[in-house]
């Protein structure tokens, strides 16, 4: 799937026409049309386009979204630590 097909499918999914998307991005309807027809490979308004479509720039370019959040599974505690109350913690230091 190319950037042009991703933009078009996401635009249709959001129920926007080319003119409405162009207005959100801050460009012309002709620019969106050229992008969707594959005449523009990497538009200069890519960050604005991604924001208007609610996707990442990486998704527009590659079809993947790199997230810094990953599920690592259930983490088991390795040991136990003593609970220190505020009173006890304060008695350790002298001022």
Swiss-Prot record:
Binds to two sets of three contiguous operator sites in the phage genome. It comes from Enterobacteria phage 434. Keywords: DNA-binding, Repressor, Transcription, Transcription regulation. Residues 18-37 bind DNA. Residues 7-60 form the HTH cro/C1-type domain. Homodimer, when bound to an operator. Gene3D superfamilies: lambda repressor-like DNA-binding domains (1.10.260.40). The keyword Nucleotide-binding does not apply. CDD domains: HTH_XRE (cd00093). It comes from the Viruses. Pfam families: HTH_3. InterPro entries: Cro/C1-type_HTH, Lambda_DNA-bd_dom_sf. One of its GO terms (molecular function) is DNA binding. This is Repressor protein CI.
């Amino acid at each position: 799937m190319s950037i042009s097909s991703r933009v078009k499918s996401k635009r249709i999914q959001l129920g926007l026409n080319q003119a409405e998307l162009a207005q959100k991005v801050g460009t012309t309807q002709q620019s969106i049309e050229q992008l969707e027809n594959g005449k523009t490979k990497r538009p200069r308004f890519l960050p604005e386009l991604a924001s208007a479509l609610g996707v990442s720039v990486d998704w527009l370019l590659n079809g993947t979204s790199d997230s810094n959040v990953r599920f690592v599974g259930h983490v088991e505690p390795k040991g136990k630590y003593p609970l220190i109350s505020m009173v006890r913690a304060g008695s350790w230091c002298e001022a």
